[in-house]
């Protein structure tokens, strides 16, 4: 998410500068802990006492079949392609140099709280990406769709998301979802709208430091484009908010 990635990178750079000043090192460490705790708490918010566990769907080798793609149970052989996909979208590529980081990413994709299916091409079974519900234990189910760059621009994302939503409703009876999209990610916005997603305001993403975010918005006014102004109007928010927030699309199938 380009805008919010830039926000988080700016915050981390600021903390790195503080860490270089020994007098403020403790304050920076506390701030880093705060950011980490916020990410963890985001995963814990609004968790239901009971939820649909998708146990039946997770056991299905083939979840759904479309005209050009199929949605399948994740396979161990998908791991390398999934990691490649994460590298293509990484804001901190050096993290992949850390021991165990790739295992952590793959483990998160296969976690019991996630319902994730691989998107595969029908003709040759090639891995293209994935569709998922990020946390099935939440009361507000968030969608995620990512495809390898080589498959961008062919309508596969729209096909995959449509098939995913229709199939979930058919099997589980669930028909309400949301998706978070960066204000500069026009292709994902078009995909959401083509699949029936409706603009529904904005949301904070990872960083929740309101004072810092307001300062960032003021200092980066020059980053606001005419296109961002049009998008902000569609979502009924001030353009500068797209520098620090993500767009929310809601789906009712």
Q: Each predicted region: which residue ranges?
A:
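Acyl-donor (CoA/ACP) binding surface of acyl/acetyltransferases
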Residues: 2-17, 30, 34-80, 85, ...
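Cytosolic beta-strand hydrophobic patch enriched in CBS
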Residues: 115-121
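Short secondary-structure boundary/capping segments within folded domains
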Residues: 73, 108-109
């Amino acid at each position: 998410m380009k805008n919010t990635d830039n926000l988080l990178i700016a915050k981390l750079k600021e903390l790195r500068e503080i860490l270089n000043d020994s007098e403020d090192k403790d304050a920076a460490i506390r701030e880093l802990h705060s950011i980490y705790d916020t990410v963890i708490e985001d995963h814990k918010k609004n968790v239901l006492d009971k939820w649909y566990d998708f146990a039946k769907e997770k056991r299905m080798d083939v979840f759904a079949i479309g005209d050009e793609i199929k949605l399948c149970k994740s396979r161990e052989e998908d791991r390398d392609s999934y990691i490649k996909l994460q590298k293509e979208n990484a804001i901190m590529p050096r993290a992949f140099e850390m021991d165990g980081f790739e295992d952590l990413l793959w483990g998160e994709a296969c976690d019991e709280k996630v319902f994730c299916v691989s998107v595969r091409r029908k003709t040759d079974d090639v891995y293209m990406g994935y569709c998922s519900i990020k946390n099935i234990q939440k009361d507000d189910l968030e969608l995620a769709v990512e495809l390898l760059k080589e498959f961008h621009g062919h309508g596969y994302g729209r096909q995959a998301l449509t098939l995913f939503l229709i199939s979930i409703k058919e099997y589980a009876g669930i028909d309400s979802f949301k998706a978070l999209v960066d204000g500069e990610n026009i292709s994902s916005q078009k995909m959401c709208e083509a699949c029936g997603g409706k603009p529904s305001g904005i949301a904070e993403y990872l960083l929740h430091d309101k004072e810092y975010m307001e300062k960032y918005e003021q200092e980066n006014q020059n980053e606001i484009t005419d296109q961002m102004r049009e998008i902000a109007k569609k979502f009924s928010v001030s353009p500068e908010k797209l520098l620090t927030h993500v767009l929310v699309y809601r789906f009712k199938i």
